[in-house]
Amino acid sequence: MPSKLAKARDSYLLLAALLAAPWCWLAFAYLTGRTFYGEMVHASGDWAVWCLMAALAVSPLRSLFPRRAWTAWLLPRRRYLGVAAFAYALLHAAVYVLRQGDLPRILAEGLAAGLLTGWLAFAIFVPLALTSNDGSVRRLGRAWKRLHRIVYAAAVLTFAHWVLTAFDPTTAYLHATVLAGLESVRLVAWARRGRSVATGGSPFPH
């Protein structure tokens, strides 16, 4: 029988709870006055980016380590990371909207490049989060993968939002560089698979 540790490792419910725990703490701390607006905006934004980066890093890591059990473990859990990214982005946006409290002001500020990129990224995340379930995968078929490829556009917009609104964008550039490096690995692996298939070789990375 599987050990308790193995059951915990494979529990999707536990993973969801771990991803939700910081969200719950951030919301509680803000509502009870333990954190201020600026701290809340930064923290929720950071968590959104971290979860997004983790979700996008799964495929490159699988390309780098195709036979490792931990990358196989990550693959079916990628959607949880994506939904968590949306949940933190939702918290990030909600805090901003509630703070402004005035729709005309929100709309006016939303036209600035720094905020417009954030709103566009958030708009892309909505359909991705709503279709991150097995039922949507079955109903949409091949269209599901095509839809979810727009996450890369959301990632670009997210980092643009971060760079344009940060007092010091150095951290944003560092995160973007790490993600770009991982994605370049995925693209190289994809190109190699294409050449391998064209020459009759294995379509899987070695």
Each model region followed by its residue ranges:
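Membrane-embedded alpha-helical bundles that constitute the cytochrome b-like, heme-associated redox core
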Residues: M1-H206
